[in-house]
């Protein structure tokens, strides 16, 4: 904002004083603003070319250890078939280092006690037939009754087993027979494939949750509370809960137990043979329940344990191409009578058995992300269990208190596991209504609780957060899941900067303060400024634009009115001459009323404080000169 200033005359020697005037443009005043929260698809396997059959040419006829395969297909020339009693060259001396065989347990049965004299003849015939079929990469399938048992041979005799190799993935690939040496070894508990974290004492328990048969179930491996118990539950020991669509199958699996094969196997043998550079070590080991699935309802959908291939489960061991699938033996005569969509503990099963690796590896540290993921999975299982109990008519289960936030991830995971087991084994009483959202205790008994904000409270716990008055049956205000009585809620509200009363409805914020919309007015005209431009003076008083100009804008020296911007304009134009302000239309000659401007003939020629044009100024000078000469 500019103030008028005096302008000195251009020259003192001129007979007529021409005073130039300057025009100033002032911008309008500023307008402050008003502010009024997978599973990955199954991993695909490439087709595996079946290796050529292996046999022992130095096996003596009548030896023990092999089974009789079916006869080869008929040939066109029967004369080319050699007789079974052909002579073979004498075997060279055996090299002790050529066969790496581990001795079995001293307390188990010997190989000679397990096999009959018929098996000895089968071994020699198998070697002869294998020589005839060396031109074909495939061998005919063995009859169902000639399945080999998982037994250990003596140290000096390698054993040739016959198994079919099937890639456990959809679509099914071509299955071929594979001979592999499986000497007996000391049973070593091995966890499934993944990152190894030794757990020497706790017994792993598998919790399988299945909603539908269209996708694999997820299993979480946790530690049991009884580390000294080692047993395998039978077909009737599995616990099933079926209020909802999910079922929970709890089994404890032994860490070290030699599984004797039965006389007849209910399932088909599947084995993945390690590469030729590695020696198969043991046919026995820890039978994990994570890889188990059941053919009656999930024949085309094998279970992947609820984890991705790139995300190993808790306590797994990383070693490629060292796992084998062995048959899971079912109880004889056990039928499957369960409902569809639920896992069964009886009937034919297929179990993944992981053989120990030959070279030991250092156990890496368990990643924290995996523990957090297992914690979330267990929490979801517990929530689903509680939801299923409520839908079936049972209240929420009573159990241990919630986990404090100061727990480590490992302790919190263990606590959630125990809480889930406790909730599943201890269904709540009929008069249980839930857990109080205020104190965390159970609400038991009629008339002891109330429901508010979609939560359950004790009657004594549902009080105002400020004055602790009981709010049952009383109106209250809910703010961020917290209850307030009406007086305390009003005291928590913002107060108007003008009337100092609490703002119950809409808040208008301006200049960093809160106002009622009807209290935010101009101090001059008292008009509401809600949604209207305004400005503030040096004292902080609020004005509308018109009243601010009327109060603080410069005034014209002729009409005494404030010089304001033209309608529709944002700038103020004024003329400053002789330390006075003029409107553009008020800057005229006082004698003739002619509009003055910057031109030579239309300029301002003041005389004795009067604004005159050039002609009027000359006329006044002549009058004054004549009067002065008369006086003399």
Curated annotation (Swiss-Prot):
GO terms for molecular function: metal ion binding. GO terms for cellular component: cytosol; focal adhesion; nucleus; plasma membrane; stress fiber. One of its GO terms (biological process) is cell-cell adhesion. PROSITE patterns: LIM_DOMAIN_1, LIM_DOMAIN_2. May play a structural role at sites of cell adhesion in maintaining cell shape and motility. In addition to these structural functions, it may also be implicated in signaling events and activation of gene transcription. May be involved in signal transduction from cell adhesion sites to the nucleus allowing successful integration of signals arising from soluble factors and cell-cell adhesion. Also suggested to serve as a scaffold protein upon which distinct protein complexes are assembled in the cytoplasm and in the nucleus. Residues 1-118, 135-249 are annotated as: Disordered. Interacts with PDZ domains of SCRIB, with VASP and with ACTN1/alpha-actinin. Pfam families: LIM (PF00412). This is Lipoma-preferred partner homolog.
